[in-house]
């Protein structure tokens, strides 16, 4: 009888990388549908553009590296990166924003470090931060939810604004954003920060039109949709519970702590949970298996750190949302976290 010697791991998962990535995309669909419903067709256009650019860049880089582009494209990692970036930027951003972002994500943040499985930082978040710092106007030009607009942009107008800068009536995005009387175009998180800095109380801030019962109109349902998709990922065991639970716990804990010592000067935990990219970050971004911590205890520390940093950046930082910065800061700490949380060998 012949015996074969093989290296570990000897217990293998039945799911391939492509299977995992496909499930991530499927579970992100509820959030995409909610974003499209509340913020218009621009989200879908950005997504299709992002996927096309990401696939082209991935194939081009693999050819330059003299490797098969087909095998790289079959793992869907480039599509996931494109998806995360597309839903993170304003729906009516100029087309070149997502192109520049994906060049940084695919070429620099991913392949410069060796490709899939070698990148120390989340590629989509690297791209987002580069875009936010380089093009702050374009990256903060969010439209009000469709519910608050008299004439939402049609599919044709959205396409024209993204690729031409003007709609069918010859109006630019800036003209459209300033043409809605009484509605500020800031996101709920930005509106809260601006209002509190102006000396208003939290209760006064929440009387603005873009707020509803729990958080910002549209944003609360987008976060609930991503939460639903995240719970499906947990149910299917595509992701582990440690990072999302720890991140949300860190966000809630710091928000409660701030309200205890400075009541009325910071947003409530519910607003933080249902605003910005909280649920997208907790279930789809922070759980990136390549750039996240690899031990159970490390994942808890990693997730809690992200949640706490999100609150600190949202409350006192220079940007309205802090998910991308928090994730990248946590990525930097992963080697240290893993070093001090690695399981000890039995007997040592």
Curated annotation (Swiss-Prot):
A single GO BP term for this record reads:
electron transport chain
Where does the UniProt annotation place the signal sequence? none
Q: Which ranges of this chain reside in the Cytoplasmic compartment per its record?
A: 1-22, 65-71, 118-125, 235-242, 287-299, 342-348
**What protein is this chain from?**
Ion-translocating oxidoreductase complex subunit D
Q: Which GO terms describe its cellular component?
A: plasma membrane
Summarize the subunit comment.
The complex is composed of six subunits: RnfA, RnfB, RnfC, RnfD, RnfE and RnfG.
Q: Which residues lie on this side of the membrane: Periplasmic?
A: 92-94, 147-213, 264-265
Q: Which HAMAP family match?
A: RsxD_RnfD
InterPro entries per record? NqrB/RnfD, RnfD_bac
Q: What is its EC number?
A: 7.-.-.-
Pfam families in UniProt: NQR2_RnfD_RnfE
Q: Which UniProt keywords apply?
A: Cell inner membrane, Cell membrane, Electron transport, Flavoprotein, FMN, Membrane, Phosphoprotein, Translocase, Transmembrane, Transmembrane helix, Transport
